[in-house]
């Protein structure tokens, strides 16, 4: 029952959005089609194409270089290439605006050095669709890098040896052998990056790029058009569910069998001279542009800022962020335990369906989840308030939608898949014989969970708590839409200050978010270094 309750909670936003869109009437969707729908669709589609190509090129190229070749500092780059994953794309957007915008250090230096006026030269506009795509590529390519690297490591060395023996040069062998074998894993990584792209709100909103994500927020808040927001959410939901199906299909194909045991593996290709330094540049560029330069820019802005991170106001933002993140992380992991244990104890179609439904939330953008939860619970609040007024002459107000608990539910729906993945990864260590031994001693399912599973799963569960905690700290669209009045977090404060062009003030909360985001990246780096 608990497992299905969790699954139904994940399904509720999608059903509510669909119902609200269908009951919104045709006038709203006709108006959207005549005005902004085409622009939203075109910008979202173009962003998907650019991010897909960018993450593929950077992620696959870097993975092949560090796996199949040897050059100076290759071990360092194996780990360093993961670090940009700690940066939310909207934080990178703030940093690069301070560097590349008209008053930024790059253009200011150009004008001072060359004696140019503002109209004497052309400079690429960072606040554009191309700029937004670049920010997303820099923080999302590690998805492709990690999966492609794992695939290259798992491939049989004999296939590469055979290709080389038949006269193929290393580059040709990569294109004809390594790349096709890694295609399912690479496709899964690109699709994960695309899911994050369509869910992004902070970057595209700050750069003024109109997508479905920004359209939902504008319709809900600026125009008060709930039906329009729901219909836009359905469009975005269709994108997301299609990607979820594709990602699941690709992940299902990404299975490899090592037939090379006992065979000779092709030694890594040693690069020398110009080739070696080109490899260093190609692997170093994503790290420099995705982590080092933004971090230096944020630290410089923070140093110039008059904001005091230890003031009562900022401590309140920190407290709000920590309360939301820790509460959501614990409850999400508890829900993952309930669902994962149900799937183990009751294998079958019912448990498999519950698990599939629960995982859909990761593919659904935060803005869609927010609208999908606010619509039914706002109706419930209004109905309850009307009944209490009529019966007891007492107003209950926004009992549910005005609390942090509905926001926590949104986080649970959004990040349950991540917690389930960590839980199931640890569950492979719990052998079926342990369950049988527990039953033979007269222990029931709950006792087996408490005394057998949980002690073994503790490291995986702590990892799940950490992953969800950090994801909640970085989540922006759901928090912006659903937070109670005057209940701001670090992400909201950073977005608000950056939107007001107060980048120095936005730097401090952004640095805290990045520092917290480094925690799971450190765990990933340890795994990369170990394997």
Residue ranges and their predicted role:
Residues 1-16, 75-81, 237-244, 267-297, ...:
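N-terminal signal-anchor/first transmembrane alpha helix
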Residues 73-74, 142, 146-160, 164, ...:
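C-terminal transmembrane helix and the adjacent membrane-cytosol boundary/short C-terminal tail
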């Amino acid at each position: 029952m608990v497992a299905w309750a969790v699954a139904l909670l994940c399904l509720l936003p999608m059903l509510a959005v669909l119902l609200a869109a269908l009951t919104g009437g045709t006038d709203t969707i006709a108006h959207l089609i005549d005005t902004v729908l085409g622009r939203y669709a075109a910008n979202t589609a173009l962003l998907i194409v650019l991010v897909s190509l960018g993450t593929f090129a950077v992620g696959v190229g870097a993975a092949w270089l560090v796996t199949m070749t040897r050059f100076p500092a290759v071990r360092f780059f194996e780990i360093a290439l993961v670090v940009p994953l700690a940066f939310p794309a909207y934080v990178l957007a703030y940093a690069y605006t301070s560097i590349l915008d008209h008053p930024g250090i790059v253009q200011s230096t150009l004008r001072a050095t060359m004696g140019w006026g503002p109209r004497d030269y052309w400079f690429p506009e960072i606040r554009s669709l191309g700029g937004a795509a670049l920010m997303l590529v820099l923080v999302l390519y590690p998805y492709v890098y990690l999966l492609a690297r794992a695939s290259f490591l798992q491939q049989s060395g004999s296939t590469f040896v055979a290709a080389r023996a038949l006269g193929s040069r290393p580059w040709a062998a990569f294109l004809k052998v390594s790349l096709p074998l890694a295609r399912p894993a690479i496709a899964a990584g690109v699709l994960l990056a695309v899911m994050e792209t369509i869910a992004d709100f902070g970057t595209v909103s700050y750069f003024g790029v109109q997508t479905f994500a920004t359209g939902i927020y504008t319709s809900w808040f600026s125009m008060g058009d709930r039906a329009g927001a729901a219909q836009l959410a359905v469009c975005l939901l269709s994108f997301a569910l299609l990607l979820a199906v594709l990602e699941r299909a690709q992940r299902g194909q990404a299975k490899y069998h090592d037939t090379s045991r006992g065979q000779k593996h092709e030694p890594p290709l040693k690069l020398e001279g110009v080739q070696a330094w080109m490899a260093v540049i190609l692997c170093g560029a994503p790290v420099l542009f995705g982590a080092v330069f933004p971090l230096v820019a944020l630290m410089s802005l923070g140093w110039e800022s008059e904001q005091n991170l230890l003031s009562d106001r900022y401590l309140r933002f920190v407290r709000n962020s920590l309360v939301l993140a820790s509460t959501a992380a614990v409850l999400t992991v508890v829900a993952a335990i309930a669902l994962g244990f149900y799937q183990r104890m009751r294998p079958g179609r019912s448990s498999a369906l519950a698990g599939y439904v629960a995982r859909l939330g990761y593919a659904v953008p935060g803005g869609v989840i927010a609208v999908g939860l606010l619509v039914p619970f706002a109706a419930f609040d209004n109905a309850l308030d009307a009944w209490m007024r009529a019966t007891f002459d007492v107003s209950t107000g926004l009992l549910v939608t005005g609390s942090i608990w509905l926001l926590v539910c949104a986080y649970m729906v959004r990040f349950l898949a991540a917690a389930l993945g960590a839980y199931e990864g640890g569950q492979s260590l719990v052998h079926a014989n342990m369950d049988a031994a527990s039953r033979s001693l007269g222990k029931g399912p709950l006792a087996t969970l408490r005394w057998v599973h949980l002690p073994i799963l503790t490291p995986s569960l702590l990892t799940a708590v950490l992953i969800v905690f950090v994801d909640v700290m970085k989540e922006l669209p759901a928090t912006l839409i659903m937070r109670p009045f005057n209940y701001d977090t670090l992400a909201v404060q950073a977005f608000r200050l950056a939107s007001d062009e107060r980048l120095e003030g936005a730097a401090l909360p952004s640095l805290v978010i990045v520092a917290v985001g480094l925690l799971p990246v450190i765990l990933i780096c340890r795994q990369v270094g170990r394997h």
